[in-house]
Design a protein with these regions (language model features):
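Conserved active-site segments centered on acidic
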Residues: 1-67
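Mid-chain, well-packed structural core segment of small domains
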Residues: 66-77
Length: 77
C-alpha cells in the first residue's frame, strides 16, 4: 500500500492519491494524509477534473488516523 503525505492534505497528496487510484485501481491500496489537515483545495479538484479524475468526495485526513502497519511505502510531497 502507498501513503501520499503532505502538510495540509489539500492539494498535492490528494492529487497524487487520485492519480494513483486511477492508474492502479484495486491492485494497490492508496491513501493520503497530512500533518496539519485542512480541506481539499478547490483548484486541485478542478485540475483533476480536467484529466477525468473526481476528487469531490475526498476529504483531508490527519496522518494520526493512518495505521502505520497498513503502509508499505510513504511518499512525501
Amino acid at each position: 500500500s502507498v501513503l501520499f503525505l503532505c502538510v495540509a492534505n489539500s492539494a498535492r497528496s490528494q492529487m497524487a492519491e487520485g492519480l494513483a487510484r486511477s492508474i492502479f485501481g484495486d491492485a494497490v491500496t492508496v491513501q493520503s494524509a497530512g500533518s496539519a489537515p485542512s480541506r481539499v483545495n478547490p483548484f486541485a479538484i478542478q485540475a483533476m477534473e480536467e484529466v477525468g479524475i473526481d476528487l469531490r468526495t475526498h476529504s483531508s485526513k490527519s496522518v494520526d488516523t493512518i495505521d502505520p502497519a497498513s503502509v508499505d511505502l510513504v511518499i512525501t510531497l
